[in-house]
């Protein structure tokens, strides 16, 4: 509900900001029984997708599934809004596959708003959070711009890109946290006055195109996946009509137009000081850094079923409007395309995440938790996952109990938080599978098994999810029990498996052999056909990955004992398998002489250290 009058009641938790982080924080805190208020400048913009109309992707899809394991909002809203499903990295193993959906913006926002309005213990309040009321170094209330105080002793800050924010398009610069919306100035000033470590980052968005003016017949179509996977582990499934996306490319003419306009770009004129996201660079950055390429992919993504708007993924820009129009019209299929809204950049304040605990609580200001872009991250999924953790942590603090543990072994959420609070950021942080050294066990398909038991114990699941998790975990245990049955190689050969191993193994252990398929198991245990596809597929993947998990754990255990191992001065980090471009850049610049020095390079991940150790051992043998 919307609560408007003067506030006289006390809230256990006040969440500031109605973006993806704020929505998850407010929802989980309320599910856990905390009396929660969600403060937003405009209730109609709650859950808005500010940039690309998509959820998931490589690494990001894992986060969404982990949010689902805690009964979060994002996965169900994604399925309600999904107009295009695509499993990324499908040709690779399930550990690094990335579920991604294209969303109808309005349907997504509607799903989030409906879920929040129906959530018990949650009040939605329209207003601008201006400052904290403090007493002896502790927050006692959140003061709104119109003078209303919201009494509370626990706050979750999810200000997104609104904190002391500026918008840029060419030579134009104006105040705003998002197009058409005001920034948060008062709160930014108070955070500065509290002497918190702040910095500035930048992000951007491309122009929005009129799809009726695109020559679709000349473009490569990309249909939705036909198999029926979804983002949420339970629910109504795919409910919206599925439509195709299309693909085009920039060309040399496009690049020449962009180069000619760079002197009017705020990215290169010095107007923008904050660093932008490495893994979602502007088209200006692409042309400057990869000028030798003859073209860059551009995915034309519909913004919804009832709108002609198209999101051109791959050409984020803050170039002047005339340059944007010219370079877009130089692209195949877009020669006559009209721009409905020009691209722009936003620069905003963030808090150095090293000032946070692993519960995302400010060390210097107890009971104030931070989530999302205020912590130096980029992306809806990263924000939502942090919001989930901040909401859980705040609710646990209110209840006087220890919070759950998200660590590098049990979740991508734990990897992200560990990276943030220990290493900090020099650019907007994006989740990648390469950041997780235990990624072989952190598959998107086993998030419920990994995390939902803990979520249930903390009272974070609604009634439907509680029932689903109880049944799913029981079904999995029963299925796993069946696969303990022993079978000889002769048994396996009798059902068509091409194996030569002479020993007898459990059926689960036989899954280590690529020649053994689900059909072979069902021939030996017909009862397997009675189990859900999700459970059987998950356990089969467990079996497939078992030997690799053993090897992974052994390598990581050995890592601790190799601090003094020298690293060749001429080591080519670009040739190391599993090392991201970001890590290649950091290590190539630092040139650490040994593994101990490598571990102290800012931003290094345990996964990167493991990859370097494995490579170094090979080249020194």
Swiss-Prot record:
PROSITE patterns: GIDA_1. The gene is mnmG. This is tRNA uridine 5-carboxymethylaminomethyl modification enzyme MnmG. InterPro entries: FAD/NAD-bd_sf, GIDA_C_N, MnmG, MnmG-rel, MnmG-rel_CS, MnmG_C, MnmG_C_subdom, MnmG_C_subdom_sf. NAD(+) binds at residues 276-290. Keywords: Cytoplasm, FAD, Flavoprotein, NAD, tRNA processing. It is found in: Cytoplasm. Homodimer. Heterotetramer of two MnmE and two MnmG subunits. It comes from Zymomonas mobilis subsp. mobilis (strain ATCC 31821 / ZM4 / CP4). Its cofactor is FAD. GO terms for cellular component: cytosol. Its main location: cytoplasm. NAD-binding protein involved in the addition of a carboxymethylaminomethyl (cmnm) group at the wobble position (U34) of certain tRNAs, forming tRNA-cmnm(5)s(2)U34. GO terms for molecular function: flavin adenine dinucleotide binding. One of its GO terms (biological process) is tRNA methylation. SUPFAM superfamilies: FAD/NAD(P)-binding domain. Belongs to the MnmG family. FAD binds at residues 17-22.
């Amino acid at each position: 509900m919307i609560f408007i009058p003067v506030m006289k009641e006390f809230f256990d938790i006040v969440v500031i900001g109605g973006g993806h982080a704020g929505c998850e924080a407010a929802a989980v805190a309320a599910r856990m029984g905390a009396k929660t208020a969600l403060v937003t400048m405009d209730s109609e913009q709650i859950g808005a997708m500010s940039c690309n109309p998509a959820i998931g992707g490589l690494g990001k899809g894992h986060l969404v599934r982990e949010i689902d394991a805690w009964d979060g909002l994002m996965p169900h809203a994604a399925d309600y809004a999904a107009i295009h499903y695509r499993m990324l990295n499908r040709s690779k193993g399930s550990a690094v596959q990335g579920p991604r959906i294209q969303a109808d913006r309005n349907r997504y926002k509607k799903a989030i708003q409906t879920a929040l309005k129906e959530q018990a213990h949650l009040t939605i309040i329209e207003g601008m959070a201006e400052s904290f009321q403090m007493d002896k170094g502790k927050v006692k209330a959140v003061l709104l711009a119109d003078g209303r105080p919201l009494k509370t002793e626990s706050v979750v800050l999810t200000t997104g890109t609104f904190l002391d924010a500026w918008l840029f398009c060419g030579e134009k610069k104006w105040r705003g946290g998002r197009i058409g919306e005001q920034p948060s100035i008062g709160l930014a000033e108070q955070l500065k006055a509290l002497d918190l470590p702040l910095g500035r980052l930048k992000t951007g968005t491309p122009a929005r195109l009129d799809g009726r003016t695109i020559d679709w017949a000349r473009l490569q179509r990309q249909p939705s996946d036909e198999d029926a996977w979804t983002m949420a582990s339970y629910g109504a499934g795919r409910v919206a009509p599925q439509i195709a996306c299309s693909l085009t490319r920039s060309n040399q003419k496009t690049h020449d137009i962009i180069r000619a306009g760079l002197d009017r770009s705020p990215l290169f004129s010095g107007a923008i000081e904050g660093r932008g996201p490495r893994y979602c660079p502007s088209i200006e950055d692409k042309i400057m850094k990869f000028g030798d390429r003859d073209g860059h992919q551009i995915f034309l993504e519909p913004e919804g079923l009832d709108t002609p708007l198209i999101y051109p993924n791959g050409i984020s820009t803050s170039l002047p409007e005339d340059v944007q129009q010219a370079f877009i019209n130089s692209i195949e299929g877009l020669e006559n395309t009209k721009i409905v809204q020009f691209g722009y950049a936003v620069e905003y304040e963030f808090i150095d995440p090293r000032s946070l605990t692993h519960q995302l609580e400010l060390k210097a200001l107890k009971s104030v938790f931070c989530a999302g872009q205020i912590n130096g991250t980029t992306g809806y999924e990263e924000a939502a996952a942090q919001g989930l953790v901040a909401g859980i942590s705040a609710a646990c603090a209110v209840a006087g109990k220890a919070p759950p543990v998200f660590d590098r072994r049990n979740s991508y959420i734990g990897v992200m938080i560990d990276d943030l609070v220990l290493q900090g950021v020099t650019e907007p942080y994006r989740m990648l599978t390469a950041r997780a050294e235990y990624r072989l066990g952190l598959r998107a398909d086993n998030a419920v098994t990994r995390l939902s038991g803990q979520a249930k114990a903390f009272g974070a699941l609604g009634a439907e999810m509680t029932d689903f998790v109880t049944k799913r975990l029981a079904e999995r245990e029963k299925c796993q029990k069946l696969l303990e049955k022993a079978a000889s190689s002769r048994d396996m050969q009798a059902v068509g498996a091409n194996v030569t191993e002479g020993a007898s193994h459990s059926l689960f252990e036989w899954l280590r052999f690529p020649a053994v398929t689900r059909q072979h198991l069902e021939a030996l245990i017909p009862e397997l056909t009675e189990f859900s596809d999700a459970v059987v597929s998950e356990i089969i993947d467990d079996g497939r990955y078992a030997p690799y998990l053993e090897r992974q754990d052994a390598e990581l255990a050995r890592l601790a004992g190799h601090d003094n191992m020298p690293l060749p001065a001429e080591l080519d980090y670009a040739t190391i398998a599993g090392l991201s471009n970001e890590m290649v850049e950091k290590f190539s610049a630092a040139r650490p002489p040994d593994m101990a020095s490598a571990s102290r390079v800012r931003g290094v991940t345990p996964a990167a250290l493991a990859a370097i150790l494995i490579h170094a051992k090979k080249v020194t043998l």
